[in-house]
Amino acid sequence: MNRRRFIKGSMAMAAVCGSSGIASLFSQAAFAAESDIADGKIVRFDFAGLQSMAQALAKKPWGGAPGPLPDTLANLTPQAYNSIQYDAAHSLWNGVANRQLDIQFFHVGMGFRRRVRMFSVDTTTHLAREIHFRPELFKYNDAGVDTTQLEGQSDLGFAGFRVFKAPELARRDVVSFLGASYFRAVDDTYQYGLSARGLAIDTYTDGQEEFPDFTAFWFDTAKPGDTTFTVYALLDSASVTGAYKFVIHCEKSQVIMDVENHLYARKDIKQLGIAPMTSMFSCGNNERRVCDTIHPQIHDSDRLAMWRGNGEWICRPLNNPQKLQFNAYMDDNPKGFGLLQLDRDFSHYQDVMGWYNKRPSLWVEPRSKWGKGAVSLMEIPTTGETLDNVVCFWQPEKAIKAGDTLAFNYRLYWSAQPPVQSPLARVMATRTGMGGFPEGWAPGEHYPDKWARRFAIDFVGGDLKAAAPKGIEPVITLSSGEAKQIEILYVEPFDGYRIQFDWYPTSDSTAPVDMRMFLRCQGEAISETWLYQYFPPAPDKRRYVDDRIMR
């Protein structure tokens, strides 16, 4: 969306909300006390007006991709871009006494070409003023930026913003909105991990994926001493517009976001993703194919967890597949889902740079009836940790047509543990490896004659110990092949049970094998459901090779 189109949209919103008239001296004084950087014209603002603005915008053609930036910004290297720092003396709420939160902005440049507009809102009068770009808001350090190219470019805007929380004001941020509609938050470890997005469009279709942009933000000024604030956002893309309201709670051990969105479709949409999240899984206990490093595991998230509308809890360990995989788990009014990082043991990662053991989980809790649809999971092959290869979102069953209006309410929890968990036994870990031999016997002098793949799933909690004397029964369902050598082993170190079985192929097919298992005692389920997708090797690879023999 170009600047002229945005201004027209802003004028439409002003018409809906009412003209500001002559601002009172009190209103001007309030803005001055909150921030010395809001310098635009004073206009009225409220969420209803933003919804009207987004709806009106959807009836007009999309403004297109962002225009070019000045050369000195467009050609920045990642190192140069990262050296540009916002001047904390010009933070948004620098003038608020006893502030517990503050806002700083990201500079446009490098790949961040969308010029995002920022507004400060007086919560008492509902009046807003724009914050225009000017070079003196930033410290350019060794970035090599020619600031003379930036003089007078007040419409340059910003790339995004980040939130700081006391006592780490201006030092360590806890929330970040940067690029398209991406945003992230941390728990009490201050370690970023996976990302969320405002919306996903056509992630897995025969066409090009579309990435909507947050093109403007309005910040309600946080109250003195408060760790909660509200920010509103306008979303825009070729297919849809949206009005968003984020109420962000920056708590001691987690960040919680209450999200309300109103979406307006410009055109038919093949696949709409609600509450999308993006993560990375390179290797873990269950997948060691590309993990030839000193790090035993490399991942931002280790599983997809789902609390289905019928009350069933599901654990689906993530994979780094050999080819792209897309799975849709059908549901009706889901209770929650998320990408979790539950393994918090440093020794399982041995990474003093990435600190994967400290990365947060992200849980989505619908706050309204979402109806029928699917929790969709896409896993993309990756050979390293720098590419996000896992995408998850809710896909409504109903097709989206041009002119449709939709609304969703949900809560996001950025925390070490999800806010709820199954009262039944839970999956702690999934391991895979060579099969076809008795447990306790390791290949040495000879290898098994018949190829098989072993799966070991560790369960903890619930009523496992009470159920053991009565008999624990693993209920295993496979889309192909056979499960043999099934064992139930008590493991004292984690005070739980390991269910182990070997998968034997019954054909030469290399199609993914869908596996499903839960534990039962006297006809009643006593565990959450474990789902897995295994990719069998080609028939000529289904043999063991003695590594001691040089070939």
From Swiss-Prot:
A GO biological process held by the record: beta-glucan biosynthetic process
Cysteine pairings via disulfide bonds: none
Modification comment: Predicted to be exported by the Tat system. The position of the signal peptide cleavage has not been experimentally proven.
Pathway(s): Glycan metabolism; osmoregulated periplasmic glucan (OPG) biosynthesis
Entries under InterPro entries matching the protein: Gal_mutarotase_sf_dom, GH-type_carb-bd, Glucan_biosyn_MdoD, Glucan_biosyn_MdoG/MdoD, Glucan_biosyn_MdoG_C, Ig-like_fold, Ig_E-set, TAT_signal
Signal is among the record's keywords: yes
Record keyword Signal present: yes
A UniProt-annotated Pfam family: MdoG
Keywords: Periplasm, Signal
A cellular component term, taken from the record's GO annotations: outer membrane-bounded periplasmic space
Molecular function, one GO term: catalytic activity
Record localization: Periplasm
Signal peptide: 1-32
Domain of life: Bacteria
Entry similarity comment: Belongs to the OpgD/OpgG family.
Role of this protein: Probably involved in the control of the structural glucose backbone of osmoregulated periplasmic glucans (OPGs).
HAMAP family: MdoD_OpgD
Protein name: Glucans biosynthesis protein D
Organism for this UniProt entry: Salmonella enteritidis PT4 (strain P125109)
